[in-house]
C-alpha cells in the first residue's frame, strides 16, 4: 500500500498578511491587498499597481548579510518556511537532516536582483555589478538557501513552470511521499517579481490590468469588465509528511494531499487552449488519483486570473469535468484579493484550500460586479460562505500551457 501524504504545517507571506492567520482572516473579510506600487516609482508605466507584501522588513527575520545579499524571493521563502516548520512542530536541530527534502516552485526567480543589477550596469559600469548576482537570480537559489538556513540535507530542487510552478512542486513532493523516497518534504513556492523589468514587460504584452484609477478593484475574475491580471508577490510553504512520519511524531495533520494531475496544452505560450482538452484532463487525473467522484468536490479554488481568455476557458473546463455538479460546487478566485503570485500562486492557493477545509468556509471572489455571460457559475461573489468542505480542488494553469491540479481532503 502506498504511503499517504499529509500537510502538517503552513507558512505564508503575501499581500494579505505576514503569516497564515492574518492572510486567512483578510481573505475571509474580502480584503484587497492590491495598491499602487511602492517598491519603485511606477510613474510612466502602463500599470502602476500590484499586490505587494507590505511592511516587510527582512531584518526582523534574517541577519544583516542575508538582508543585503538575498533576493526578496529567497527572503520570503525562508520566512514562510520558518512559520511552516514551527506550525508542524519540526525542529531542524532535533531531526535527521537527511530525512527532509525541499521542493520549491518559482516562475521567474531573482528578477528583482536582475532589475537592480541591470540598473547598476547601465548607470555605473560593469565593475559595479555584484559578483553574487549570478547566484541570487537563479530559481534554485531559494531551496538552496532554505536548506542552508535550516540545516536540511535531503534532496532539494526548484520547479520552474510559470504560473503552475508551485502547484507542480507540491505535486512532485506528493510523488516523493507516495513512492517512499521521502517522509518529509518542505514544499511550496515563492515569487517577488514586482520590479520595473517585469511590470513593463507584462504591461507591453497586454497581460496586465490598467485600472490605475482604482487598483483595489482591478483584479476581477469572471467579471465582464476584467482587463488583465494583477501582479502579486509572496510565498507559501507547506510541510508534507507521510502517514508513517505523522504517526511516529504524534502530530495531527491539517489535511491530506490526495491527488495531483498535470498536463500540457501544446497550443500557445500565453493563450489557453479553447478546446479545454488538456486542462480538463489534468482535473480528471487529480480527481481519479484521489479516488473520488467529481460530485464529491465541495470547493474549487479557481486559477481565476482576471484575464479575458483564462476565466471563460476555466469555466468551460469546470463544466466539462463536473457536468451538472458545476452548478452546485462552490468556486472562488482568491487572486481577486492577492493578485497573481505567478510561480507562488499554486502553493498560496493550496494553503487557502486547506484553511477552507479546516474552517468549512469558502473565501470570496471580490470585485465581481458585472457577471460575464460566459462565466455563469457560483463564484462566491457576495462574501465568504460557511458550508461543509470535505474535498477542495485547486487549479493552476500557467503560461506555456502548463496545467497542474491538486486535490485536498479533510482528515476529520
Which positions does each model-derived feature cover?
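Phosphate/pyrophosphate-binding loops at sites that engage ATP/ADP/AMP, CoA/4′-phosphopantetheine
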Residues: 84-96, 245-250, 283-299, 321-325
Amino acid at each position: 500500500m502506498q504511503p499517504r501524504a499529509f500537510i502538517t504545517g503552513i507558512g505564508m507571506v503575501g499581500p494579505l498578511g505576514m503569516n497564515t492567520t492574518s492572510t486567512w482572516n483578510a481573505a475571509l473579510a474580502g480584503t484587497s491587498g492590491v495598491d499602487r506600487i511602492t517598491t519603485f516609482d511606477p510613474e510612466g508605466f502602463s500599470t502602476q499597481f500590484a499586490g505587494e507584501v507590505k511592511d516587510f522588513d527582512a531584518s526582523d527575520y534574517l541577519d544583516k548579510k542575508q538582508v543585503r545579499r538575498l533576493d526578496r524571493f529567497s527572503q520570503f521563502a525562508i520566512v514562510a518556511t520558518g512559520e511552516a516548520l514551527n506550525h508542524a512542530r519540526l525542529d531542524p536541530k532535533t531531526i535527521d537532516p537527511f530525512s527532509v527534502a525541499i521542493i520549491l516552485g518559482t516562475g521567474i526567480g531573482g528578477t528583482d536582483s536582475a532589475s537592480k543589477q541591470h540598473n547598476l550596469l547601465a548607470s555605473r559600469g560593469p565593475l559595479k555589478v555584484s559578483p553574487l548576482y549570478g547566484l541570487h537570480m537563479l530559481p534554485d537559489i531559494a531551496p538552496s538557501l532554505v536548506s542552508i538556513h535550516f540545516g536540511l540535507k535531503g534532496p532539494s530542487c526548484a520547479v520552474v513552470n510559470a504560473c503552475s510552478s508551485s502547484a507542480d512542486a507540491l505535486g512532485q513532493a506528493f510523488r516523493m511521499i507516495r513512492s517512499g523516497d521521502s517522509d518529509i518534504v518542505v514544499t511550496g513556492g515563492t515569487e517577488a517579481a514586482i520590479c520595473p523589468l517585469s511590470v513593463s514587460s507584462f504591461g507591453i504584452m497586454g497581460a496586465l490590468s490598467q485600472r490605475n484609477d482604482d487598483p483595489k478593484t482591478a483584479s476581477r475574475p469572471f467579471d465582464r469588465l476584467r482587463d488583465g491580471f494583477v501582479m502579486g508577490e509572496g510565498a507559501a510553504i507547506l510541510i508534507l509528511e507521510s502517514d508513517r512520519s505523522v504517526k511516529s511524531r504524534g502530530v495531527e495533520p491539517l489535511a491530506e494531499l490526495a491527488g495531483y494531475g498535470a498536463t500540457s496544452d501544446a497550443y500557445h505560450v500565453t493563450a489557453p487552449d479553447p478546446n479545454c482538452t488538456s486542462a480538463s484532463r489534468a482535473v480528471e487525473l487529480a480527481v481519479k488519483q484521489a479516488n473520488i467522484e467529481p460530485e464529491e468536490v465541495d470547493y474549487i479554488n479557481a486559477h481565476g486570473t482576471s484575464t479575458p481568455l483564462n476565466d471563460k476557458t476555466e469555466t468551460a473546463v469546470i463544466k466539462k469535468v463536473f457536468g451538472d455538479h458545476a452548478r452546485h460546487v462552490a468556486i472562488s478566485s482568491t487572486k481577486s484579493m492577492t493578485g497573481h503570485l505567478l510561480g507562488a500562486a499554486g502553493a498560496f492557493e493550496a494553503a487557502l484550500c486547506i484553511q477552507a477545509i479546516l474552517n468549512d468556509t469558502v473565501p470570496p471572489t471580490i470585485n465581481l460586479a458585472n457577471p460575464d455571460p460566459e462565466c455563469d457559475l457560483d463564484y462566491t461573489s457576495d462574501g465568504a460562505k460557511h458550508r461543509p468542505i470535505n474535498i477542495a480542488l485547486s487549479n493552476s494553469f500557467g503560461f506555456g500551457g502548463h496545467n497542474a491540479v491538486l486535490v485536498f481532503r479533510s482528515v476529520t
